[in-house]
Amino acid sequence: MSQSPTNVPRSYNSVLDLKLASPTNSASGATGGWIVQKFGGTSVGKFPENIVDNIVKVYSQTNRVAVVCSARSSQTKSEGTTSRLLRSADLAENDKDYQPLLNAIEEDHVTNAERIQSEEIKQELIKDTKQEIEHVRELLHACQIIGEISPRSLDSIMAVGEKLSCLFMTALMKDHGLNAVYINLQDVIPLSYDFQKGFDDSFYQFLSQEIGKRVLQCDKEREGEEDVIPVLTGYFGVVPGGLLNGVGRGYTDLCAALAAVALQADELQIWKEVDGIFTADPRKVPNARLLDSVTPEEAAELTYYGSEVIHPFTMEQVIRAKIPIRIKNVENPTGKGTIIYPDNIGRRGEATPPHPPAAFEQLAMSSLLQRKRSATAITAKQDIVVINIHSNKKTLSHGFLAHVFTTLDKYKLVVDLISTSEVHVSMALSIQSDQESQLKHALVDLRKMGTVDVTKKMTIVSLVGKQMVNFIGIAGNMFKVLADEKINIEMISQGANEINISAVINEKDTIRALKSIHAKLLEGGSAIGDSSAVDTRLEALKLS
């Protein structure tokens, strides 16, 4: 008799949860569609057995599962494998000794292989690990001789982090009885690919198709075997100018998104070390609540202004394909998590949704009849520098602004918020410790245009909510809360899409501002007004 798998969510926060709990699904083989699960480097470093036994193994009982892994991190991203590989490359380029750092990476991964019980699988993993590290040594030696590292070489060095992580997770899954297969995507982009159009939609469509082909080819080669679990490297090949410059450190999320699109997945799952998206950072605001769902627009704003959710560009790929994204916690796999719903639940041009309305009728009432809210969440972005420039009037206003932005672009400084008049500009910039030198040089150039005042140690506090556009007085309420707390506002801004209201305040007031705004606008009496866009779509679907 078929049984529902254990350790699955009992609050049906998505159609996938319904499949997992359904008694009609066999525990011996997957009957549902694909799901793509992306695991970050810290999760792979700290909780690999939990990932295999309580997540991949459980979901693979009812669905086809594809896994994408970031490079392994034992504690923090700064001490992760990718960061250490990049530091090794920097040492080699400057003719310094990179061997100790590379030896530490090798030792860390070989030691980690001791988690594998099967001696055969363990020794194979150690052999593969040492081969990858030796490849990096050869590359770094060559780069040290010529005194420079090309973007292509840097990509190849950086790719080893994802390879080592996926080799380990594949071995661990095999050790725990799963039919996992390692798929290296390093050469998924052919050398003949024409990049004349750059990173446009056609490139990502092509890349998605190629990733899908690799997965389906793997299936075909193992036809007749128990359902294969492909483990994909988050790194997906050499691109002009380098992957870091072209995509950034979020390339693993992007790879998972493209795989989900290619496989027409039921869901893309992003597994982190938090339960989902909260109304505020629970480390700073103890009363913060877990959100059952947010819209893509809200998730994008929260990501940009301080909450690490998922990169907006990555999210765009799956939202366009009408695939839900679920944020879940590797330490609490049975938790509800947070769903990011597409704007239109139907997908691929269909008039009807991908899943029958009857399934949605069984969704948790918390998803269908969410509390009506004016704002969704409050977030903070620290390490902000405010620059005020008053023109010396030697240039016209358009020339003044052009000079300002040209200077910022020259030193690769990004503006988070800006307020302008004909002869005055106020800007809030996020400046990390490794950008201090660029900021210093930029200020020298900016002072040629007029008087420049700089204020450091500031924070951008942002109130986010798609329904705020329908409420009168939200901005006034937010600023009144700050005034009541005697918190001075340096700058204010409202996004053109009207789902984000931001204020720049002193960094020392950050926690007090978050707590007070959360208490007054996101708790209790704030639950008034129209329902969220997600509520409206799901309710309409329920009644159809």
Swiss-Prot record:
InterPro entries according to UniProt: AceGlu_kinase-like_sf, ACT-like_dom_sf, ACT_Aspartokinase, ACT_dom, Asp/Glu/Uridylate_kinase, Asp_kinase, Aspartate_kinase_CS
Keyword Oxidoreductase attached: no
Disulfide bonding pattern of the chain: none
Catalytic reactions on record: L-aspartate + ATP = 4-phospho-L-aspartate + ADP
Disruption phenotype: Sensitive to sulfometuron methyl (a compound that increases flux through the threonine biosynthetic pathway). Does not decrease survival in a mouse model of infection.
GO molecular function, one term: ATP binding
EC number: 2.7.2.4
Pathway it works in: Amino-acid biosynthesis; L-methionine biosynthesis via de novo pathway; L-homoserine from L-aspartate: step 1/3; Amino-acid biosynthesis; L-threonine biosynthesis; L-threonine from L-aspartate: step 1/5
Class of the enzyme per the UniProt entry, highest EC level: transferase
Record GO cellular component, one term: cytosol
Domain ACT intervals: 463-535
Claim: Kinase is one of the keywords in the record: yes
Keywords: Amino-acid biosynthesis, ATP-binding, Kinase, Methionine biosynthesis, Nucleotide-binding, Threonine biosynthesis, Transferase
GO terms, biological process: 'de novo' L-methionine biosynthetic process; homoserine biosynthetic process; threonine biosynthetic process
Pfam families membership: AA_kinase (PF00696), ACT_9 (PF22468)
Function comment: Phosphorylates aspartate, the first step in the biosynthesis of amino acids that derive from aspartate (the aspartate family of amino acids), including methioinine and threonine, the latter of which is a precursor to isoleucine.
NCBIfam families assigned to the protein according to its UniProt record, in alphabetical order: asp_kinases (TIGR00657)
Similarity section: Belongs to the aspartokinase family.
Protein's recorded name: Aspartokinase
Gene name linked to the record: HOM3
